[in-house]
């Protein structure tokens, strides 16, 4: 369910079509995207836009009730992991709900992307900079 405005028409469209528990992926430049899943490619060059920039825009527009993250981010990208947890903490306060954080293996994560409504690819080039957002409702 949409809750704001975004300039990218593909992102705006996919968020407006999300129902409760539907999923949307924000990923780094290297995540394989299944052919069966809609790809919204925002990557311009390495690092542009960053994972956190794309995630910030998407979560400003989307009501989030849960997220799925690869367990490997804790060891291989701890700085981004901490930044991500801080972002989710602020998002919880802004939305007025608790966001469930689930961890899975990177292999399972990649399989789950096939079930998502779309995958939004950032220009991020750091390991495991990927998240599955599970849509909530605003009421």
UniProtKB/Swiss-Prot annotation:
Top class in the EC scheme: isomerase
Catalysed reactions listed for this entry: beta-D-ribopyranose = beta-D-ribofuranose
Biochemical pathway: Carbohydrate metabolism; D-ribose degradation; D-ribose 5-phosphate from beta-D-ribopyranose: step 1/2
EC number(s) recorded for this UniProt protein: 5.4.99.62
Family matches, as Gene3D superfamilies: RbsD-like domain (3.40.1650.10)
The keyword Chaperone belongs to this UniProt entry's keyword annotation: no
Function: Catalyzes the interconversion of beta-pyran and beta-furan forms of D-ribose.
Name of the protein in question: D-ribose pyranase
Originating organism: Escherichia coli O127:H6 (strain E2348/69 / EPEC)
Phylogenetic placement of the source organism: Bacteria, Pseudomonadati, Pseudomonadota, Gammaproteobacteria, Enterobacterales
């Amino acid at each position: 369910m949409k809750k704001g405005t975004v300039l990218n028409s593909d992102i705006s469209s996919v968020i407006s079509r999300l129902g409760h528990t539907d999923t949307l992926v924000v990923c780094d430049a290297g995540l394989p995207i299944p052919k069966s899943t809609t790809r919204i490619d925002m990557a311009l060059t390495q690092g542009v836009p960053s994972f956190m920039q794309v995630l910030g825009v998407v979560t400003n527009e989307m009501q989030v009730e849960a997220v799925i993250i690869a367990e490997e981010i804790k060891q291989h990208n701890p700085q981004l992991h901490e930044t991500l947890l801080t972002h989710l903490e602020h998002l919880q306060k802004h939305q007025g709900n608790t966001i469930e954080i689930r961890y899975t293996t990177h292999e399972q994560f990649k399989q789950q992307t096939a079930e998502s409504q779309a995958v939004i690819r950032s220009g991020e080039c750091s390991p495991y900079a990927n998240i599955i957002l599970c849509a909530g409702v605003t009421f």
